[in-house]
């Protein structure tokens, strides 16, 4: 963790160009004390969170001033807590402490579905992708809390199929009306299109 933060600081100080930093992944990056210490988890408890808190307080302004982007990938972990109410309301958490959450300008929560109905398969029945649910947990650019679903593909057709999520995004628009299985999209100039969600 220390090496990642130090490298970003060094690159920001030696380069005047805008940069994109991608950290994959925060959860699997150990601190120095994790590597040099023993197997007792209590010996390095909250060390990574404290390092990240210090690191983000140092890097947030330089990243913003250079108009760079810092993209952090993380994993969901089961929230082990003694509070039954918190277990029900927040079953998952992300490693790294709250400093990262406060520093994020945009926080996107992706969860995959385990049901076979969410699998994307090819003509031979092999799985080539999966449908994920996406929620905008935090945003300094727009309305947070919005949700959509889209499909992530891997292999030769790697990428995101997000056409269906466009329909979810415009369902609340006054230009789109719904009657049964049919949607009508009004362009505002007297013309419109009628379609079903399967033909979107």
Model-derived segments and spans:
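Conserved inter-motif catalytic segment of the P-loop NTP-binding fold
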Residues: 1-54
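Catalytic phosphate/metal-binding cores of nucleic-acid and nucleotide-processing enzymes, i.e., regions
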Residues: 10, 14, 110-112, 135, ...
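Short secondary-structure junction motifs
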Residues: 18, 67, 178-180
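Phosphate-binding/switch region of NTP-binding enzymes
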Residues: 45-173
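Acidic surface patches and DE-rich sequence motifs
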Residues: 122, 177, 187
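PDZ/PDZ-like groove recognition
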Residues: 169-179, 183
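Terminal-proximal interaction/regulatory segments of ATP-powered molecular machines
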Residues: 181-200
């Amino acid at each position: 963790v220390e090496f990642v933060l130090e490298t970003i600081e060094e690159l920001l100080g030696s380069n005047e160009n805008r940069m994109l930093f991608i950290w994959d992944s925060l959860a699997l990056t150990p601190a120095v004390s994790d590597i040099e210490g023993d197997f007792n988890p209590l010996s390095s408890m909250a060390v990574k969170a404290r390092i990240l808190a210090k690191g983000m307080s140092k890097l947030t302004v330089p990243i913003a001033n250079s108009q760079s982007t810092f993209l952090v990938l993380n994993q969901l972990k089961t929230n082990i807590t003694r509070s039954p109410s918190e277990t029900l309301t927040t079953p998952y958490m992300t490693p790294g402490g709250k400093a990262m959450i406060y520093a994020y300008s945009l926080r996107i929560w992706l969860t995959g579905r385990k049901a076979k109905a969410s699998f994307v398969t090819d003509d031979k029945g092999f799985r080539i992708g999966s449908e994920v649910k996406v929620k905008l947990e935090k945003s300094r650019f727009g309305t947070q809390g919005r949700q959509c679903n889209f499909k992530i593909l891997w292999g030769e057709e790697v990428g995101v199929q997000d056409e269906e999520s466009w329909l979810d995004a415009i369902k609340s628009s006054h230009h789109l009306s719904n009657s049964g299985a049919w949607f009508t999209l009004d362009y505002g100039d007297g013309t419109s299109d009628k379609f079903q969600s399967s033909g979107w």
